[in-house]
Amino acid sequence: MIRSIFLGTPLAAIPALGVIHRVTDLRLVVTQPDRPRGRSGRPRPSAVKEEALRLSVPVLQPRSRQELVNGVGEARPFDVGVLVAFGRIVPVSALRLANKGFLNLHFSLLPRWRGAAPIQHSILAGEGSTGVTIIEMDAGLDTGPVLASSVQVIAPEDTSGSLEEKLAFRGAQLLVDLLPDYVEGRVRPRAQDDAQATYAPKIEPAEAGLDFREPAGALARRVRAFNPRP
């Protein structure tokens, strides 16, 4: 059986975590430290941590790059690392610890919309479709070679929340289909064309306001893109 570790944080990573747990020997889940949330300001675990504990999988919550590298090293030997919306850059020294490599499931058709907010930016741009891409991770931000991708239509009523859910499940299925062939060396990576790259930086709450001087279509896209959050 394929030996794996998983890195992710939000609810959107749960479908992939579920399939990785089902089809591999999942050795470790890495997620962000508990953060203050809600009116109480009490630290709360990430969605991925809660699910990992439910599945009885060991959890690592590193607070530094070195803690991340050390924790991943202690999970060896493992064949593959799978990352979905982890929220931090993984050092190259950690990427080298997998026998085969680290995969990143990204919620766009790379090289379009590299970065932290691809779903919101695809809606803001008025695009009719987007998708998911699995890349082999390298030192860059979403720059690694493409292993697989799948197109998803953006419905006129889609919000970032509804589209994220669709992409999360589409990506999880793509992982199931890809993993055996990847580990056996039967997948030919395809380099991204950097000249075609566009970028999707994180959108701060202050940027999510509405300017009613904008056309109605642009306002509607902003409402959809920032629902349920920027």
Listing of model-derived features with the role each one plays in the protein:
Residues 1-228:
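One-carbon transfer enzymes
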